[in-house]
């Protein structure tokens, strides 16, 4: 059976891994998942990620903790296959008053809500991370 929403699966694996205090989580790799992992690393929500080149590429995300607590408090899918959510540059949400990020898929690639506002572009809101 095929996976209906691979991005939601990725976010759930991260959420469950941190709830169980795992060091890392593994999942099937895809270009969009790697781009999301890169954004999460750049913003300091995860320690790192690696893509294993095998017959079926696998993405391993190393989770980050601070004083024994997960750095990611909430990670929530917004736009999904059954209901796409698009926002213009002026409508992009500020997650937790600017403490969190919204990952946005724009015509210029995947970026945070702050970067999208600076570039003056809107797009599909993939998820919220705080």
Curated annotation (Swiss-Prot):
Part of the 30S ribosomal subunit. Contacts proteins S5 and S12. InterPro entries: Ribosomal_uS8, Ribosomal_uS8_CS, Ribosomal_uS8_sf. GO terms for biological process: translation. PROSITE patterns: RIBOSOMAL_S8 (PS00053). This is Small ribosomal subunit protein uS8. SUPFAM superfamilies: Ribosomal protein S8 (SSF56047). The keyword Transcription does not apply. One of the primary rRNA binding proteins, it binds directly to 16S rRNA central domain where it helps coordinate assembly of the platform of the 30S subunit. GO terms for cellular component: ribonucleoprotein complex; ribosome. GO terms for molecular function: rRNA binding; structural constituent of ribosome. Keywords: Ribonucleoprotein, Ribosomal protein, RNA-binding, rRNA-binding. It comes from Shewanella denitrificans (strain OS217 / ATCC BAA-1090 / DSM 15013). Pfam families: Ribosomal_S8 (PF00410). Gene3D superfamilies: 3.30.1370.30, 3.30.1490.10. Belongs to the universal ribosomal protein uS8 family.
